[in-house]
Amino acid sequence: TSGFLYRKVAERLPRDRVRVIMPTTVGLGFSSKIPASDHTLNNHIGWINTVLKELELNEVIYAGQDWGGPIGMGALSLSPEMLKGAVLMNTVFNAPKEKADLTTMHARVKTPILGELLVELLFNPFEQLARVQGDPSSWSDDVIRLYGKPVLESGNSKAILSMMRMVPDGPDPVSYTH
C-alpha cells in the first residue's frame, strides 16, 4: 500500500538507467484523505491509471505487492501498451473459489462496529508491520512511526479498515465489480 516499504530497494536501482515512481495508495499516504466508501478496487485502479497516463510512461516494469498487485496491474490493463514487464509479490488477482479469510484479523474487521473498535481504537496495524513484512530487525521504531504517520496523524484509520475489508474472502468479494 506504500512505496515506502521498498525504499531500500529503490535506493539501489541505477538511477541513470531507470526512473523510479513509487505511488502510495490514494488516501493512505500524505495525499488528501478520501471517504471510506471511495476505497474500492475500481476507484484505485482508475486513479493509478490516470497518474500513469499523465506521466506519459512507456516500457514500464511494474513491481507491485499486496494491494499493489490488483490495483497496479488493473491500472496497466487499461493501458497495456505501457507495460514491458512485471514483478509481483504477496498479492492476489482472482477471488478465492471457496469462502476463506486471509487472517483472523481480516475476519474480525469485517464485522461492523467490532472492526471500527479494533482498527480505530485498539489495534495499530503499523505496529505489526515488523512482524509480518520481511525481516523484523529491519523495522526500527522510527521507521514504523514514519510508515504510519500519514494515516495516524490525520485520524484516517477508516482507510486502513476499508482496505482490510476489501480483501477477497470468497467467490464474490465486495471489492470486485463485475
Where are these regions (language model features)?
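Active-site loop/oxyanion-hole signature of alpha/beta-hydrolase fold enzymes
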Residues: 22-64
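Flexible "cap/lid" loop of the alpha/beta hydrolase fold
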Residues: 85-116
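Conserved hydrolase catalytic core segment
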Residues: 59-97
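Helix-loop "lid/cap" segments that line or gate small-molecule binding pockets
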Residues: 124-138, 146-152, 163-169
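Conserved small/polar residues in nucleotide/adenosyl-binding loops
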Residues: 177-178
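Conserved HGGG/HGGXW glycine-rich cap/lid loop of the alpha/beta-hydrolase fold
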Residues: 1-30
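Conserved catalytic-core motifs of eukaryotic protein kinase domains, centered on the activation segment
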Residues: 6-7, 31-37, 98-99
